[in-house]
C-alpha cells in the first residue's frame, strides 16, 4: 500500500494541462489509487441518489458529469501505460484490476436509484428548458443505462454482474496471451541470406532484436498485429516468407499456455448469454442497436454487397500474380505467403513502381513535421511545439504542445512511434485528459504506432503503409484535440463505434495531396522531392490490389459478425475455432486460401480484447462517409482553412454531443453516398 498523501495519482498534477507526472508514478501506486478513486466515485453517486428533491438537470445530470473525475484521471493514466509499456508488473496489476473495474462500472451503470432519476428527466424532456446538448445528454445517459441493464430486476442484475466480471478477466487474459505468444513466435534466422530483400536498416534492426535476446550473430523478425507481415513484400526467399506467415497465423492456437481458443469461445458464449439477458437475439444485435448501423442485418447487407466484387477482383489479381510465377524458371502454385512479394512484381511491371524503394523519401521526422503537422496547420491553423521538459510514460514518447492560430492553447499531443516487447500490436489513439468546459480541461491525446526502431544512429524510414497509419491515427488525435463540448461524456472520440473511424480515415487524404507530399516526401540524403512520375504512378495504382485488401478486411469483419451472431446455445456447441472460421468465410465467398483473413480469431485483439466486438465492420461503414467527404473537399478547393474550419466546427468539434449522422448532414448537406467508396476500391465495375 502507499500513503494517499504521497501517492502522485491522488494528487492534482502541477504540470501543464494536467499531464500526469510519470517521473513520480511507480507501479505500486496504481491499485491503491484505483481503490481510493472507486470509493470517491461511489460517494459521489450516493450524493446524487440521496437527494430528496425532484430530479433536475442540475442536481442529477450535471452532478453525474462532475463525478468520477479522480477515477477517470487514474484510469486514463494507467491504461495508457498498460497498452504501451506493459511490463510484467503492469500486466499483473491489469489482471487484478479487470474484475474490480467491471464490478465498479456495473455498480454505477446498474444503480436503480440513479437510473430512476435519469428516467424521470427523460420522461419529462418535453417540459424541460434545455439546450440541444443538454437534451442529448439526458437521452444518451438514459439509453446507455438501459442498454447496460439498469432496467433489469435484481436477480438478472446479479447474473449480469457475474458475466461482466468474468468477461473482463477473459478479455484481459486474451490480450496477455496474445502479447506473450507474439513475442514467443518472433522468427529467428541464422543467416542474413535468408533475409535477402530487406533494407540495410531492417537487417540491422533484426540483428539488434537477436542481440537483445542473447542470440548474437543471428537475426530476429518480430511479428505485427496483422496476419500479413510487411516484410512479405520484399523477402526474396520463399521459405523465409512461409516461416514468417505461418508464425503469424499460429498465434494463440498452438496448444501452449498462451492458447486463446478456449478463451475466445467462452467470451463468445458469455457475450451471447448477456445479450439474451438484455433482451437481444445475439451480441451483434445488442451492439448494433446502439450504433449508426442499427442492426446486424444492415451490417450484413453492406458486407455481402462488397464481398462479391471484392472476391471477384481478388481472383483476377491472383491470376495476374500466377502468370508472373509461371514465367519463372521454377514455377509453382501461388500461396498466401507469396501474394505480397509477387504483388510488388506486378506493380513494378504494370506501373513501373517499387513501393519498397520509396522509404528513403519517407523519413519519419520529416513526415511528421512537414507532412502530418503541416497539413493540420494549413487546414486548422494549429501549430506544434515539442516540450522536452514534459515527461511522458516512456523515453520514446514525445510531447508536443498545440496552439491555435490566435495563440490560444489547444492541448497536448503525445507520439509514441516505435515497437517494443511491452507494447501491444497495432496502432491506436487514446486520451489522458478529455476536453470539457464543465471541468475546465483541455485535452491530452496519445498516438501509438509500432514502427521498428532502427539501430542507433540510423534514420527511421517509413513504408507508405506506415505513413498512412501515422496520418490515420493523427486524424483520431485531431478528433480528440478539437472537442468543444461542455460535458465530458461527449468529449472528442466519444462517438458511436461505427462513426469513430470516419475522421481518422478522412485525414489520410492529405498523404498524396500535392503541396503536402511535396513538403515531406524528400530523399533523406539529397533532399530531392519524390519524382513527379513516381507520384503519378502512386495515384494511378491506388486501386491496385484492392481486391485482396478489401477481401482480407471483409473476411475479418465477417468472422467477427459470425461469432457474435450466435446465441448462447449455438456458441456452446462450437468446439473447433478453425472449422467455424472456414464455414463462415465459405458462407460469404471469402474463402480463397491465397487471401488469408486480416485476423484469425485467436489473435483478433480488436474484438476479443478491444472495443470492437461485433463492430469491426466499423472501418468500412465509416469509409462510406470518408470517401464521400473526400469528394466534398476536392469539390471545394481541398486544403484550405475555410474547409478545415467547417470540418472542425461541424464534425470534429461536436464530439458525441449530437447524433453523428445529423452532424454529418450538417457538414455535407445530405446523407453520404456509397458511390465514391465503390469507385475508390474498384468495386463498381
Q: Can you annotate each of these PLM segments?
A:
Residues 1-199, 633:
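N-terminal helix-rich structural modules
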Residues 39, 43, 47-54, 70-87, ...:
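Intrinsically disordered or highly flexible coil/loop and linker segments, enriched in small
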Residues 133, 137-139, 166-169, 176, ...:
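Active-site-proximal, well-structured secondary-structure segments within enzyme catalytic domains
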Residues 260-272, 444-447, 485, 654-656:
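Short, hydrophobic/aliphatic alpha-helical segments
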Residues 69-80, 139, 143, 339-347, ...:
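Short, hydrophobic/amphipathic alpha-helical patches that form generic packing surfaces
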Amino acid at each position: 500500500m502507499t500513503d494517499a498523501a504521497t501517492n502522485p495519482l491522488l494528487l492534482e498534477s502541477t504540470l501543464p494541462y494536467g499531464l500526469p507526472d510519470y517521473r513520480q508514478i511507480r507501479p505500486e501506486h496504481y491499485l491503491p489509487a484505483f481503490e481510493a478513486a472507486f470509493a470517491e466515485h461511489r460517494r459521489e453517486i450516493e450524493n446524487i441518489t440521496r437527494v430528496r428533491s425532484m430530479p433536475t438537470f442540475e442536481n442529477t445530470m450535471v452532478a453525474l458529469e462532475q463525478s468520477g473525475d479522480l477515477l477517470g484521471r487514474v484510469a486514463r493514466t494507467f491504461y495508457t501505460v498498460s497498452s504501451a509499456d506493459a511490463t510484467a508488473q503492469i500486466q499483473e496489476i491489469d489482471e487484478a484490476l479487470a474484475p474490480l473495474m467491471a464490478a465498479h462500472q456495473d455498480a454505477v451503470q446498474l444503480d436503480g436509484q440513479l437510473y430512476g432519476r435519469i428516467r424521470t428527466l427523460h420522461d419529462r424532456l418535453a417540459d424541460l428548458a434545455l439546450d440541444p446538448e443538454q437534451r442529448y445528454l439526458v437521452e444518451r445517459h438514459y439509453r446507455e443505462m438501459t442498454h447496460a441493464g439498469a432496467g433489469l430486476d435484481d436477480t438478472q442484475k446479479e447474473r449480469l454482474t457475474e458475466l461482466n466480471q468474468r468477461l473482463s478477466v477473459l478479455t484481459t487474459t486474451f490480450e496477455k496471451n496474445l502479447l506473450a505468444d507474439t513475442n514467443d513466435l518472433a522468427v529467428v534466422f541464422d543467416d542474413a541470406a535468408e533475409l535477402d530483400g530487406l533494407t540495410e536498416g531492417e537487417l540491422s534492426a533484426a540483428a539488434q532484436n537477436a542481440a537483445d535476446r542473447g542470440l548474437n550473430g543471428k537475426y530476429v523478425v518480430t511479428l505485427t498485429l496483422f496476419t500479413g507481415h510487411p516484410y512479405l513484400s520484399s523477402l526474396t526467399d520463399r521459405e523465409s516468407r512461409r516461416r514468417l506467415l505461418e508464425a503469424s497465423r499460429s498465434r494463440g492456437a498452438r496448444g501452449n499456455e498462451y492458447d486463446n481458443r478456449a478463451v475466445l469461445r467462452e467470451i463468445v458464449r458469455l457475450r451471447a448469454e448477456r445479450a439474451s439477458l438484455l433482451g437481444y437475439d445475439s451480441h451483434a444485435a445488442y451492439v448494433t442497436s446502439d450504433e449508426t448501423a442499427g442492426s446486424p442485418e444492415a451490417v450484413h447487407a453492406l458486407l455481402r454487397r462488397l464481398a462479391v466484387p471484392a472476391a471477384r477482383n481478388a481472383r483476377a489479381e491472383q491470376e495476374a500474380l500466377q502468370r508472373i510465377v509461371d514465367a519463372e524458371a521454377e514455377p509453382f502454385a501461388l500461396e498466401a505467403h507469396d501474394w505480397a512479394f509477387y504483388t510488388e512484381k506486378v506493380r513494378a511491371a504494370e506501373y513501373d513502381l517499387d513501393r519498397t524503394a520509396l522509404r528513403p523519401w519517407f523519413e519519419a521526422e520529416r513526415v511528421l513535421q512537414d507532412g502530418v503537422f503541416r497539413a493540420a496547420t494549413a487546414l486548422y491553423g494549429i501549430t506544434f511545439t515539442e516540450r522536452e521538459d514534459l515527461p511522458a510514460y516512456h523515453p520514446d514518447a514525445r510531447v508536443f504542445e498545440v496552439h491555435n492560430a490566435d495563440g490560444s492553447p489547444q492541448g497536448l499531443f503525445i507520439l509514441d512511434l516505435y515497437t517494443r516487447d511491452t507494447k501491444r500490436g497495432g496502432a491506436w489513439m487514446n486520451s489522458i485528459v478529455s476536453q470539457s468546459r464543465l471541468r475546465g480541461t483541455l485535452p491530452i491525446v496519445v498516438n501509438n504506432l509500432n514502427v521498428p526502431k532502427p539501430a542507433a544512429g540510423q534514420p527511421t524510414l517509413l513504408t507508405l503503409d506506415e505513413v498512412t497509419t501515422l496520418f490515420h491515427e493523427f486524424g483520431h488525435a485531431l478528433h480528440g484535440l478539437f472537442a468543444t463540448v461542455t460535458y465530458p461524456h461527449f468529449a472528442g472520440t466519444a462517438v458511436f463505434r461505427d462513426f469513430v473511424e470516419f475522421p481518422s480515415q478522412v485525414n489520410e487524404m492529405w498523404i498524396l495531396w500535392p503541396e503536402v507530399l511535396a513538403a515531406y516526401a524528400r530523399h533523406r540524403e539529397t533532399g530531392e522531392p519524390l519524382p513527379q512520375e513516381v507520384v503519378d504512378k502512386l495515384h494511378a495504382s491506388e486501386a491496385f490490389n484492392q481486391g485482396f485488401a478489401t477481401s482480407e478486411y471483409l473476411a475479418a469483419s465477417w468472422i467477427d459478425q459470425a461469432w457474435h451472431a450466435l446465441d448462447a446455445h449455438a456458441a456452446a456447441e462450437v468446439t473447433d475455432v478453425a472449422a467455424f472460421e472456414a464455414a463462415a468465410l465459405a458462407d460469404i465467398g471469402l474463402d480463397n486460401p491465397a487471401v488469408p483473413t486480416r485476423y484469425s480469431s485467436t489473435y483478433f485483439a480488436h474484438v476479443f480484447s478491444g472495443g470492437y466486438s461485433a463492430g469491426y465492420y466499423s472501418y468500412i461503414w465509416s469509409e462510406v462517409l470518408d470517401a464521400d467527404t473526400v469528394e466534398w473537399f476536392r469539390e471545394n478547393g481541398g486544403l484550405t482553412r475555410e474547409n478545415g474550419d467547417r470540418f472542425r466546427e461541424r464534425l470534429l468539434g461536436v464530439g458525441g454531443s449530437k447524433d453523428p449522422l445529423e452532424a454529418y448532414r450538417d457538414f455535407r448537406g445530405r446523407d453520404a453516398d456509397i458511390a465514391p467508396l465503390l469507385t475508390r476500391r474498384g468495386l463498381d465495375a
